[in-house]
From Swiss-Prot:
Lineage: Bacteria, Pseudomonadati, Pseudomonadota, Betaproteobacteria, Neisseriales
Keyword Iron: no
Family: Belongs to the universal ribosomal protein uS3 family.
GO molecular function: mRNA binding; rRNA binding; structural constituent of ribosome
Protein known as: Small ribosomal subunit protein uS3
Gene source species: Neisseria gonorrhoeae (strain ATCC 700825 / FA 1090)
Keyword terms of this UniProt record: Ribonucleoprotein, Ribosomal protein, RNA-binding, rRNA-binding
Annotated ranges, domain KH type-2: 39-107
GO biological process: translation
Gene giving rise to this polypeptide: rpsC
Function text: Binds the lower part of the 30S subunit head. Binds mRNA in the 70S ribosome, positioning it for translation.
Amino acid sequence: MGQKINPTGFRLAVTKDWASKWFAKSTDFSTVLKQDIDVRNYLRQKLANASVGRVIIERPAKSARITIHSARPGVVIGKKGEDIEVLKRDLQVLMGVPIHVNIEEIRRPELDAQIIADGIAQQLEKRVQFRRAMKRAMQNAMRSGAKGIKIMTSGRLNGADIARSEWYREGRVPLHTLRANVDYATSEAHTTYGVLGLKVWVYTEGNIKSSKPEHESKQRKAGRRNAAAN
């Protein structure tokens, strides 16, 4: 199951948290969800060069709080904060409620799956060979401390007539282990030959320890050994 399912959804409430944190009545749910999708699409286009890794949307009492995780916060804020004010106005029009925007810096962008995927997509759009772009991103991630990384690209690679998929992996990426901290992201590269799809898995340190007491697990192991001996 871990091979097919979205790794982020698979690990929600274990090592991952929700990107949208709000509650809505069943009659309003579709409207609020559509607003979230519009906001994310707008930010993806507006901040294409700001290396945005994650956008968190919260909706406390008749307002909204948006947290943008970016490797280049200066690009998001702009000179003297001009760009962030324009951003707030546009988001307020989209959501129809007062907006508060927080900017958080990503310290190690080489380990952020979304930034890696978007970076490779931009290189593919500039006609960089896909193997070179993928291997360079993998080397940077492993050099920065990743325990494993896997990158897959699909489509008309190098302008081939028949679409195919190629993937490369370095280190280990345990997709079945729920406590493993696996960051997953997708992106698209729009080239003259069509759209190329990208998927990135990054495995970093930060496994969650078992909540069971250590002495309890030892007692159970001892009990199993005694049962096997009898």
